[in-house]
Amino acid sequence: MNLLYRKTKLEWRQHKEEEAKRSSSKEVAPAGSAGPAAGQGPGVRVRDIASLRRSLRMGFMTMPASQEHTPHPCRSAMAPRSLSCHSVGSMDSVGGGPGGASGGLTEDSSTRRPPAKPRRHPSTKLSMVGPGSGAETPPSKKAGSQKPTPEGRESSRKVPPQKPRRSPNTQLSVSFDESCPPGPSPRGGNLPLQRLTRGSRVAGDPDVGAQEEPVYIEMVGDVFRGGGRSGGGLAGPPLGGGGPTPPAGADSDSEESEAIYEEMKYPLPEEAGEGRANGPPPLTATSPPQQPHALPPHAHRRPASALPSRRDGTPTKTTPCEIPPPFPNLLQHRPPLLAFPQAKSASRTPGDGVSRLPVLCHSKEPAGSTPAPQVPARERETPPPPPPPPAANLLLLGPSGRARSHSTPLPPQGSGQPRGERELPNSHSMICPKAAGAPAAPPAPAALLPGPPKDKAVSYTMVYSAVKVTTHSVLPAGPPLGAGEPKTEKEISVLHGMLCTSSRPPVPGKTSPHGGAMGAAAGVLHHRGCLASPHSLPDPTVGPLTPLWTYPATAAGLKRPPAYESLKAGGVLNKGCGVGAPSPMVKIQLQEQGTDGGAFASISCAHVIASAGTPEEEEEEVGAATFGAGWALQRKVLYGGRKAKELDKVEDGARAWNGSAEGPGKVEREDRGPGTSGIPVRSQGAEGLLARIHHGDRGGSRTALPIPCQTFPACHRNGDFTGGYRLGRSASTSGVRQVVLHTPRPCSQPRDALSQPHPALPLPLPLPPQPARERDGKLLEVIERKRCVCKEIKARHRPDRGLCKQESMPILPSWRRGPEPRKSGTPPCRRQHTVLWDTAI
């Protein structure tokens, strides 16, 4: 700005000097006019000063312009003002009196500017060129060569239209061509033809160019307007109406392209076939059969409405409809996308929702609704439960895979039967009764194939999580499903109560310990993932929540158990039967190895039940599966290896496992022994408890304390079990009496002492003993609850064992502290944690 100011000042001084010279010369020349000349000179100077000041005042906005133009056009006082006003020529001409030279300069500048404007216009707008050129340059050219110029304009304009012609997908370009030509009458002759061909698509014969345009336009029109071609009505008229053969070819091409789109868009083979005589309809037909089951209501309904509109409706109407339909249809065709529509609308239809997933996963079972009566029934019931998608995801990824849509899990299902089984879980075969009934058939395949058991476990996990409350109804169905050993049936019923379908995987797991264990582990992880998905809590929490819910529902302690489960998410997940997914594995262990149940029970009733194979293998597998599960993985991993070792030790006396849903638990109690309540009150052999205590395993501590503490979560928290304790709490609500029996003393007593009674309990815990023990457990529970309440109050007073720590890392704290530290200072906050978890959930 300073430089500009200085420059302008210098220029102004120069102007001043020049003006003074001129004025002096004028004064000398005309003596008579000396007065006026003198007056004029001062006036000019004043004007210059005023203009300069004004430009400076303007904020130098005009200064640059003045600098640029002032030297060249004129150095008169008007230069700055004229430049600022953008009317140098007029201003100069007005004030050009001072010097003729300035007048000449202004004229030059004016001549320069007008041509510049026309030059600019021609480049920007063709229409402007005509008037500008006519006015400015050559009226003769305009008048004489109006025809040539219009032709040139036409050619130039025709070129842009050609581009649109090249792109048959651009309607606007076509409309532009139509709209633009009207302005220039010279093109009128061709335009009518083009318009006729374009608008009616019937008149394209007159000119080859017109025909070509119609062809392109027809393609465009068919694609956009005549999307109805897929309908077939539009395609017919354009082809028939369009006299030009090229348009027909274009139409056929467009039809082919549209056929592809239609296939994607219209799942209905019939409508697609009708709409099109081309081969694409068969593809549509083939794909729709696979998908119709998946999305029969939506896909078929949509296609029906869309197709009629496309066929009968105007092309423009069809176009908007066509674009949207393909996407839904594509979703149908593509399983991943199907998940959203499926789950809500299609899944709600009994067979459809389930069939979608199965259909997507395997077109082999396009009759997703019919693939297996069991599946449809389950699916019908299952559609409501949202957990299934998580289950499917869990099948693939475990807890992390929750987000996966059904389509993702389905591909992994791979095997036809497993798919069917998975379909049930995916379709949310949550309802335990149906799930239990349907799984009965799958169990054999699951037993046959280790992979299928996993799927089953996962699917059942889904069912289990979905059926948190419905587990009670499932319990009756569970025993029939567990057609294997009576224990299996009982355990299945218990697990069904807790996990609904989870119990089945144990049966297959029994058939193939390793495969079953693997499946059980996967199921556990999936279960947890499913549960976690329903409850925002981590997968481990979710898993236990479901089982906890199950037996709490049985014991009418539903609300609390979830909280306990969430607390257990850290460690109780595995402990309580509430660990729906793990329970299949643990159940298997309990069923096959009473000791396994006892030892593993400490980890979780679900685990004990679920692990049918060698406890170690299954436990390890469970741990591995839990790895994917997140929290549950951590706990199970920690517990898995240790528990597996402990299970071997506890196998002898582990049978007395106290964790089972109360209602189903009673049935399983005989099998498990002391597993009176869904809470994994693990009445483990003294060995199992001691081993766990020695291992410092959270699961071990749970095993020892869980029996007493599970029933009374507070005591268990005070004691070894944090998670088991919570489960005990929920179990106490749900009637985990077995744990209560052992609980009061387990809290006070070392785990070893507790573990010893457990082995005895498992044996005496047949159904008859269980009720008595339950009664005792109730009394013990009351006592334990009081103790726990006191401890909790104390713990609350202690900020170190506040809920925050437990909430954030329920598992890690137990690991860090180890069973013994908890014994010494069982943090009553565990219960608080449960409450917090409930709120979090």
UniProtKB/Swiss-Prot annotation:
Write the record's keywords in alphabetical order, separated by commas. Phosphoprotein
**One Gene Ontology term from the biological process aspect of the record:** phosphatidylinositol 3-kinase/protein kinase B signal transduction
- What modifications follow translation? Phosphorylated on tyrosine residues by FYN upon stimulation with CNTN5.
Residue ranges with Basic residues bias: 114-123
Instruction: Enumerate composition-biased segments (Pro residues).
Output: 279-295, 759-769
Question: Which residue ranges have biased composition labelled Acidic residues?
Answer: 252-261
The record's region (Involved in CYFIP1- and NCKAP1-binding) falls at 76-186
Q: What function is annotated for this protein?
A: Activates PI3K and concomitantly recruits the WAVE1 complex to the close vicinity of PI3K and regulates neuronal morphogenesis.
This protein is called Neuronal tyrosine-phosphorylated phosphoinositide-3-kinase adapter 1
- Lineage of origin: Eukaryota, Metazoa, Chordata, Craniata, Vertebrata
Q: Which gene encodes it?
A: NYAP1
